[in-house]
Amino acid sequence: MYKRQPERGLRSQVTVDPKHLERYRQVCGFRDDGLLPPTYPHILAFPLQMALLTDKRFPFPLLGLVHLENRIDVLRALGGLGPFTVSVAVENLQPHDKGATFSIVTRLEDQLGLLWVGDSKVLCRGVKVPGEIPPKAEQEPLPLEPVDNWKAPADIGRRYARAAGDYNPIHLSAPSAKLFGFPRAIAHGLWNKARSLAALGERLPASGYRVEVRFQKPVLLPASLTLLASAAAADGQFSLRGKDDLPHMAGHWSRLQG
């Protein structure tokens, strides 16, 4: 059960199922290091996020929302199985040249306080809101080198759906994806991010860091993917690319200040 917070979204108490955690690690390529994968709180929060987005008071249709960007802040090491308090809220409504964007902000807390924060920037096409379109922040690109490559099999959308609970039809099969204009099923954006962070491994610290990604071209399944990254450092960049160097996702990591 979740508790309704009219001014702040929804919140709930959650615990980690070890068998489910192991399934997620296997699907996304994370090794068992005794910590939760940095993307796993998204999975803990997904039922609550769906409850918020399907609430009758939510102003935008769920169908057709596009996940543009995702940011996570790992404030402390993600140890233990809970209980945790997870909360979700919709924030930062802004105009966009194709409609409007908003952020699904997710927070995970333990008994010591705030542990993890996620921000998923979502586009709703055709919606008009007042204000000026914010400028896009661009980083000076760093030299990247290949660090790993893997196959994204035709069934990875279904396998990830079973681990994450996200059964969006564009990820499940070619027939269901074609109903939404895709020639084949496409990989979940958060699977692309999770698989990439698993491959980055020790380039990322255990805590006190941020990872931001921008989703680019969809990964049509099956696919062969290559991860490129800058040298190991406190701050760095990475890119997930497919056949003919097609860009699927661009990201960077940085140390949190303070």
Where are these regions (language model features)?
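Hot-dog-fold acyl-thioester-processing enzymes
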Residues: 3-69, 129-203
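Hydrophobic residues on conserved beta-strands that form the core of alpha/beta folds
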Residues: 7, 11, 117, 208-210
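Short, glycine- and charge-enriched coil/turn segments that flank and shape catalytic ligand pockets
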Residues: 31-34, 110-113, 206
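HotDog/MaoC-like acyl-thioester-processing domains
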Residues: 50, 68-152, 219-221, 226-258
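Intrinsically disordered, low-complexity segments enriched in polar/charged residues with Gly/Pro
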Residues: 58-64, 80, 92-96, 204-206
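Short, structured beta-strand/loop micro-motifs enriched in basic residues and often containing a Trp
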Residues: 65-71, 207-212
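Catalytic-pocket segment enriched in acidic/His residues
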Residues: 175-226, 230-232, 240-245
